[in-house]
Amino acid sequence: MIKELRIISGPVSISQFNLNRLRENDPQILTACPNPPPEAVKAGKAIPVPMGEFSIDIILDKLPSDFYPDLVQMSARNMHFMPRGLDKLTCPKVMKIGDTFHWGDESLSGMIRYCQSFDCDYHWVYQGVQHLHFFVEAGLKNVFWLPGTPVIEHYVPQKKEAKSYDIIFRGSQSSLHVYRSNLLKFLQDNGVKIDISRKPYLESLEDYSKSRIVLNCGLNGDTNRRIFEVLMAGGLLLTDRLSPQSGLFSLFEEGVHLECYDSENELLDKIEFYLKHPEQAEKIAIAGHQKLIDCYSQQAIQQKLYRYILQGEIEPPFRLEHDTRVLHINQPIDEKKFVIRLKIYELIQEIHRLNSRIKLLYWKGRNKELLSDLADLPRLDITYANTTEALADVKTWCSKVEVKDQVQLQSLPLELTGGKQFQMVMVDLPDKLLSIKELLVEIEPQLPESGFLLVVGKATIFTKVMLSILARWSGLLPIRICAANSHHQLGVGACLVYQKLTRPSQAHLVKSTPKLFVPKLSLKAKVSQGLSSLPLVNWTKTLIRNSGLIKN
């Protein structure tokens, strides 16, 4: 019998403890967590530990005499939960990683720092699989991934009955889910009778099995829990189409086990089709459910985890075979460049979370690794533009790491159709100050009104000042972008961000380009976007223009 010690930062409900007598092949699990249920403590299934930093001796002193763990599993969830002295345990230590798309301490870079502080033997990613290459590049040991079914509670769908719903969505709508909320509103505005609510876990699963179509819209291009919950319940899953690096299409086949959409119109078309063809919808739902039960059930994934940790055996694609970027990491890494890439990715990932589609131009860039980093954001349309000679190296790189279908390469001069089309333009910080003015002249035609310029690189104070002066002459205001509902500034030390204020005489050229919704802007950025009609804001806008900082 395998004995597992779990050290968890969050509260664990009584339903997550198996208080019954174990079956022959069941693992014996002991959970150390803050405020465990008294029944679990009494049954010898839990050990209470404090929040924050504490010594592992608290756990070791309370281990049953017949229990020494075969492995210890932790979770990178609360960055302030710091058990110390794990080296006193001689068994393998495993760090479980998920939700890699937040900010602050729980950001991608924050999780990497947290994992590095423990130096675990294995690192298991169950959500945010597209970020595996960052963990490998950061030097974490034995990074692998497995489907997230072990983090959800088991459910067996009841006998099939008549469908109660045509299409449903069960989940959150908030300021953190702007894209999702807009998508749901789009469906309602177009006459789709979708049942939207947030219900308890079990009730949601029951509804999944009673609906002809279950809509999923992940938070930020990740394989979220709802994917596995819907398939476990036997519903037809209609989910946003993710990148190959997400791992979704290494597990399931589109059109066979689930269905996907890439745009609002495609979503409408597929809803209409499957409501008119319920037999095909049911066929896919049955196949998806069976695939999950046969290959990715909680028990099956738990056994895969134990087999790898304790016996060193793991089958493709879970050893990262699905993401070729992992195979082309240059060691030793340049730590400064790595941190810059991480921060740029986190900034653009946060903007990606809020928008249905983003068009980004990387102008004459030298950072091909950054280019392939960004390729896994499914709603980010990337164009890389450079001379024919420079394109050859980037084309080779994109083919090598298998992102060539996710990045459009264009040689200069850039020919645009339909006017200015890029909401964001990204450039590298010039090596020489004399090159800044020339660079701004080059990219000016590519930026529409309210478009954003990202200058990638760590700039000195003098360079920042000079760049800001020249940028203002080009109608670009320096801004700061913060994460939603926070004062956490994104991209600090990795890039400078500017927003384009188009001259009135040029406004007719840019009306077709959609504006980006960004998490949080400085006052100047809000003024330039016209996000507020308050008299104070209008007065401020006039004051700024009259000051000569912006040329009319």
Where are the model-predicted features located?
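Conserved acidic donor-binding segment of nucleotide-sugar-dependent glycosyltransferases
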Residues: 257-264, 274-278
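Membrane-proximal basic amphipathic "stem/tether" segments
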Residues: 4, 21, 324-330, 489-552
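A short acidic, Gly/Pro-enriched loop at the edge of an enzyme's catalytic core
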Residues: 415-425
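C-terminal amphipathic helix plus adjacent low-complexity
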Residues: 269-338, 502-524
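Nucleotide-sugar donor-binding catalytic core of glycosyltransferases
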Residues: 1-62, 66-67, 71-88, 92-254, ...
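A short glycine-rich, Lys/Arg-flanked "PGG" loop and its adjoining helix->strand segment in the class I
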Residues: 437-452
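Class I SAM-dependent methyltransferase SAM/SAH-binding core
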Residues: 368-405
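Class I SAM-dependent methyltransferase Rossmann-like catalytic core
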Residues: 327-356
